[in-house]
From Swiss-Prot:
It comes from Shewanella amazonensis (strain ATCC BAA-1098 / SB2B). Monomer. This is Formamidopyrimidine-DNA glycosylase. GO terms for biological process: base-excision repair. The gene is mutM. It catalyses: Hydrolysis of DNA containing ring-opened 7-methylguanine residues, releasing 2,6-diamino-4-hydroxy-5-(N-methyl)formamidopyrimidine; 2'-deoxyribonucleotide-(2'-deoxyribose 5'-phosphate)-2'-deoxyribonucleotide-DNA = a 3'-end 2'-deoxyribonucleotide-(2,3-dehydro-2,3-deoxyribose 5'-phosphate)-DNA + a 5'-end 5'-phospho-2'-deoxyribonucleoside-DNA + H(+). Involved in base excision repair of DNA damaged by oxidation or by mutagenic agents. Acts as a DNA glycosylase that recognizes and removes damaged bases. Has a preference for oxidized purines, such as 7,8-dihydro-8-oxoguanine (8-oxoG). Has AP (apurinic/apyrimidinic) lyase activity and introduces nicks in the DNA strand. Cleaves the DNA backbone by beta-delta elimination to generate a single-strand break at the site of the removed base with both 3'- and 5'-phosphates. One of its GO terms (molecular function) is zinc ion binding.
Amino acid sequence: MPELPEVEVTRQGIAPHLEGNRVEALIVRNANLRWPVPELAQNIVGQTILGVRRRAKYLLIDTQAGTTIVHLGMSGSLRVLPKNTPVEKHDHIDLVMQNGRVLRFNDPRRFGAWLWSELPEAAHPLLEKLGPEPLSAAFHADYLQAALKGKKKAIKLCLMDNAIVVGVGNIYANEALFAAGIHPEAEAGKVDAERLTLLTAEVKTILTQAIKQGGTTLKDFTNADGKPGYFAQKLHVYGRGGETCTECGHLLSEIRLGQRTTVFCSLCQTK
């Protein structure tokens, strides 16, 4: 599943081809995504793209008339192509631009979304309850300590809770907790301020590195020009259960936590 760095890399890749350009057509070949593509999505036709933003794992394509909200789901991707590029399997939507380019949405598993909103961002049901961006100044140790106060849930589950902080999915939660030396099952409300300071710093560092390297390549992700990401080469724990720890040589443990695979070093990471 594309996580925050992959979505941000996609945003950076498509924005220069969309911003300031006018939409010629919206072609919907298959409207049956996670939610049906609404008829109102056609309201973008004739509009000039004012900006392409990211909020959590949502891409927001802004126009004066409203905003197209795109979610890549489990296997979705957006690519900017010449207008006459032949359509391939799972190419469900084309946003055709007057500059001769097309933004093409491909999604084999169809868990992604293509929606339209004329509401303020803070009022949209998908966006209104989201926590701060992890790379913003609003995400810091004092904030996280207050957000976790009294919580008995595992710290990893809280780190992946979009109401607490957005966009820290399974890959990067595993990696940040390893870098901070925190056991993923540690009771969130009992993690002290010093370790939360380290954790917030590691979240920012790891996400920034992943964005710079084009995201993490797993089964499905390629960025906007079709190239894979390379951060998978840097992973210390994710996907490495049963292998040796890169720091101490101990075998990495693998468990299920919140129905997600969780990998950690029981020596380097403490509760």
